[in-house]
């Protein structure tokens, strides 16, 4: 789980660099407004969603080890490519450096050109980032299925999924400071390079349980305990592991729709906060992410998501207390979690209250 945890942490760090730097550092240079940033994040989300439809097949086809390497390699390259958008924009519009870009009169035709050209370069880099990041969770879930029996997979998933929370926690503590000290370009490069470091460890550390020298016979037996089980009166075992299910057939399963409904209710809220909270705090209250108060507020916001570790334990608790099968226990837990984001509606009446 440690490698999966760190991969997911890097995944969310890379995803957060733009949201934590655009308003304070990037917008003045490229003359952006909310339209440009909103379009970039929307296209990223769409590409990410579409790529997720095929990422699982890609991981199955490449194998867990190679598939994960490809995924994190592509998204790390995409993350680093953001740093080149300034140079590309300068070359396109014929200006020598970032200072010249910022010196262009706001509202002029040249400023509009700079904004549009830079936006398209960022969209290109963002699409590559989305292409690679889409492979993280399918690969991590596949590794979890290889190393844990069904009853333990929810908890194992919550552990690596907590990497998203840790990434979101550390992002406001590090990224604005990097951008303030060395420029927003270095923030993308430094954070993006973490993925290449992870790849070096993955090459040497990952092996399937049956091939891993540190997995003994008793542990292997525990891992494989439910590879032979009875489902609807039929024995399901290793001989059926190679069976392929088409994408369209998955839409006929109630499990697919239950999972999609749960994600629909939670992910929209999470991504909205992820992309827009830093900008909102700056525009509404004048709180900059590179300052102490901004860091503290963002850190507090994301600290709450650490509860996801305990959330992954809930299905196991339900199984032990009620005797439900793993699927039913997970669906019950997911239903509970799906309604929790609705609590954010209670914050609306407090929107006009100042923190001072």
What do the PLM-derived regions correspond to, one by one?
Residues 125-165:
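Cytoplasmic helix-loop-helix junction between adjacent transmembrane helices
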């Amino acid at each position: 789980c440690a490698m999966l945890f760190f991969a997911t942490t890097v995944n969310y760090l890379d995803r957060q660099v733009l949201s934590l730097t655009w308003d304070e550092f990037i917008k003045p240079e490229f003359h952006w407004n909310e339209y440009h940033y909103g379009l970039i994040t929307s296209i990223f989300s769409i590409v990410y969603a579409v790529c997720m439809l095929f990422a699982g097949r890609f991981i199955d086809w490449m194998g867990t080890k190679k598939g994960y390497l490809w995924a994190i390699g592509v998204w790390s390259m995409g993350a680093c490519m953001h740093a080149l958008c300034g140079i590309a924009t300068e070359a396109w519009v014929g200006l020598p450096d970032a200072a010249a870009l910022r010196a262009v009169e706001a509202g002029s035709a040249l400023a509009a050109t700079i904004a549009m050209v830079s936006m398209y370069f960022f969209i290109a880099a963002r699409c590559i980032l989305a292409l690679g990041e889409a492979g993280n969770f399918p690969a991590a879930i596949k590794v979890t299925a290889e190393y844990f029996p069904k009853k333990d997979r929810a908890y194992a998933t919550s552990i690596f999924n907590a990497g998203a929370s840790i990434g979101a926690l550390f992002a406001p503590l590090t990224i604005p400071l990097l951008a303030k000290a060395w420029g927003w370009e270095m923030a993308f490069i430094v954070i993006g390079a973490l993925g290449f470091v992870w790849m070096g460890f993955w090459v040497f550390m990952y092996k399937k349980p049956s091939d891993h020298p540190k997995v003994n016979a008793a542990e292997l037996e525990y891992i494989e305990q439910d590879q032979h089980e009875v489902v609807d009166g039929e024995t399901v075992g290793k001989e059926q592991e190679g069976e392929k299910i088409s994408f369209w057939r998955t839409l006929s399963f109630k499990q697919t729709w239950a999972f999609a409904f749960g994600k629909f209710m939670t992910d929209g809220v999470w991504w909205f906060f992820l992309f827009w909270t830093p900008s909102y705090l700056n525009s509404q209250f004048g709180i900059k992410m590179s300052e102490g108060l901004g860091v503290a507020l963002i850190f507090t916001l994301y600290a709450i998501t650490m509860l996801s570790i305990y959330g992954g334990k809930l299905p196991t608790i339900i199984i032990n207390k009620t005797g439900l099968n793993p699927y039913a226990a997970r669906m019950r837990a997911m239903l509970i979690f799906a309604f929790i984001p609705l609590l954010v509606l209670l914050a609306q009446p407090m929107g006009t209250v100042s923190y001072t």
